[in-house]
Regions:
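N-terminal secretory signal peptides that target proteins for export/translocation
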Residues: 1-17
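Bacterial N-terminal signal peptides
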Residues: 18-30
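Cell-envelope and extracellular/periplasmic
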Residues: 38-417
């Protein structure tokens, strides 16, 4: 019988195997040193929900996902508590395929990317910041409410994040939901009560999320403001009864009176892609910074951030005085970031559909509007203007009022009576 000779002696084979195993082990150790297992004890989950602006549509992404994954020692994560950013679909099968092939063609800039970075900078190192989007583009609030596919998918993602956290023995809490929806309810004229439906969806989410997470604290909404009035085909700025302002005015009313609503900011100060409806990446980041400020306020238990909104309207003869909550920072007029609007965005519309505003003057906390006639029973408005079908800070509905801290005034439509 012929005996096969080994290429290497047995001892040498063992030595080579050991060397290879050591090399593999060193690679694994090196990899793990770059991707340390989390030692964090708390997961703060702050997702965004709404329609196309919540999903960042058309906002060309400027956030690099590798950099986002590495930011703050990897503490910014998705609903799976990983760094697989940029994949979204309400269809689970489609989402699986997108993740499998790392499909990022429709991965846009989201406000929550910048929000998460701001929060990670301000919050302790033992805390993960969990972010993800939910909702559906071009969809009215009625089709995003409880029982709809987007709503249930959003709850599924929250449940996934909670289960991942608890499997690791970590505390999990949702301090707030970022709300970015309203454009479709402005332009499509649905026969619904937006004010009532927005309050209801927050109540539903609050109850459903607490049922998942078992947290005791309520979950407020951090609200932007949709400003796309001119995209509505029937919009006329001087129409006394202006249906299109009902949605943006809802945000002002709730920020004024409801403790469960906090402010980020309006969208009109930012450029819109093609001057249509979607704010660009810089606008998304700006909204994200404002949202982070409110989330931090919620976490710290500070006074509620309501944004720059009117808190009172009075008349003195032919002059209207509008009071604002300026939080100690004076009002200013800015025609650099936002192109100058007529009367800096203010108008006073009487029942004859005539703008009777003549001039405005500001001091640290109030705006005084001088009118051409007695303004009793008129509508005082801000940022209710713009060119037909245009949006954004150049030709869309806009105004030039902000405070010295950079908070832009919310669009509003208030009766003087």
């Amino acid at each position: 019988m012929v005996t096969r000779r080994h290429k290497y002696p047995i001892g040498k084979i063992s030595y080579i195997v050991i060397i290879k195993l050591l090399a593999i082990l060193m690679v694994i150790v090196a990899f793990m040193s770059c991707h340390k297992p989390y030692e964090h004890k708390t997961v703060l989950c702050i997702p965004v929900y709404g329609q196309s602006l919540a999903l960042g549509e058309e906002a060309e992404r400027v956030t690099d996902f590798d950099s986002l994954a590495a930011y703050a020692n990897g503490r910014i994560v998705t609903e799976n508590l990983d760094h697989d950013f940029g994949h979204f679909d309400n269809d689970k099968k489609k989402l699986f395929v997108k993740r499998l092939v790392n499909y990022l063609k429709h991965s846009y800039e989201l406000s929550i990317y910048k929000m998460a970075q701001e929060l990670a900078d301000a919050i302790e190192n033992d805390t993960l910041i969990c972010i993800f989007p939910g909702g559906q583009g071009a969809t009215a609030i009625s089709n995003l409410s409880k029982g709809t596919t987007p709503y249930e998918r959003f709850m599924d993602n929250i449940k996934t994040a909670y289960e991942e956290a608890t499997a690791n023995g970590w505390e999990f809490i949702i301090p707030a939901i970022c709300w970015m929806q309203g454009e479709s309810d402005i332009v499509d004229y649905p026969k619904t009560d937006y004010h009532q439906m927005l309050k209801q969806i927050r109540k539903d989410m609050n109850a459903d999320i607490k049922n998942i997470t078992h947290q005791n604290v309520d979950i407020p909404f951090v609200c932007y403001q949709a400003n796309s009035l001119t995209r509505a085909k029937k919009f006329h700025a001087n129409q006394y009864d202006c249906r299109e302002t009902y949605v943006p005015q809802t945000f002002v009313n709730l920020l004024n009176t409801d403790e469960h609503f906090w402010a980020s900011g309006p969208t009109y100060p930012y450029a819109c892609v093609g001057e249509k409806i979607h704010i660009d990446a810089q606008g998304q980041q700006a909204i994200g910074r404002l949202a982070a400020r409110s989330v931090l306020g919620i976490l710290k238990g500070t006074e509620r951030i309501r944004g720059l909104i009117p808190t009172g309207v009075s008349t003195e003869g032919e002059t209207i005085i509008v009071q604002f909550n300026t939080s100690g920072t004076p009002l200013v007029l800015d025609t650099i970031q936002v192109r100058k609007a007529n009367h800096y965005g203010f108008s006073v519309i009487n029942k004859e559909n005539k703008d009777i505003a003549n001039d405005i003057a500001i001091d640290s906390t109030t705006v005084r509007i001088t009118c051409s006639e007695n303004p009793t029973d008129s509508k005082v408005r801000y940022a209710v203007n713009g060119k037909y079908m245009k949006s954004g800070n150049q030709n869309g509905p806009r105004g030039n009022l902000r405070d010295a801290s950079g908070n832009w005034c919310y669009q509003f439509d208030i009766s003087t009576r």
